[in-house]
Amino acid sequence: MSAQTDQPITEQQKKEQEQYTNLINSLPTRWEIELEFVQSLSNIPYVNYLAQNNYFNDENFINYLNYLQYWTQPEYSKFLVYPNCLHILKLLQDENFRKNIINQDFMNSLMNDMVKRWQSNANDQDENKEKEENKEVPEVRINGTN
């Protein structure tokens, strides 16, 4: 029965309800949207785009960036694929950074610094892996055998 008219629900209404439910269930959750947005901050040209389009002049947007700091907590950050986005999120808390990121040279410098950091981290990981592979395995003796 329909709550509004005390009439039985038609097949068409059932179908429409099912379609509506499927649509609602297919939409991303707030958590998913925020995860995607926070990770998009690792894209420096996108951050520059936000500056060029005056997002950083909107107090509501600045408050939103502050709210997103919860992603720095381990229970949330473990879901990040691009953890450097947290570094950018932290930088965006600073008004001077928000003003400077609109500058193309500043943006390029930041991108170059990030690439150097990635390369350095990759080299460090390669060296650590090589050291692990070259470690001598201690000889294990079982019950007095050689």
Swiss-Prot record:
Its main location: nucleus. Residues 126-139 have a biased composition (Basic and acidic residues). One of its GO terms (cellular component) is core mediator complex. Residues 121-146 are annotated as: Disordered. The gene is SOH1. Component of the Mediator complex, a coactivator involved in the regulated transcription of nearly all RNA polymerase II-dependent genes. Mediator functions as a bridge to convey information from gene-specific regulatory proteins to the basal RNA polymerase II transcription machinery. Mediator is recruited to promoters by direct interactions with regulatory proteins and serves as a scaffold for the assembly of a functional preinitiation complex with RNA polymerase II and the general transcription factors. Belongs to the Mediator complex subunit 31 family. Pfam families: Med31 (PF05669). The keyword Transcription regulation applies. This is Mediator of RNA polymerase II transcription subunit 31. Component of the Mediator complex. It comes from Candida albicans (strain SC5314 / ATCC MYA-2876) (Yeast). One of its GO terms (biological process) is regulation of transcription by RNA polymerase II. Keywords: Activator, Nucleus, Transcription, Transcription regulation. It is found in: Nucleus. One of its GO terms (molecular function) is transcription coactivator activity.
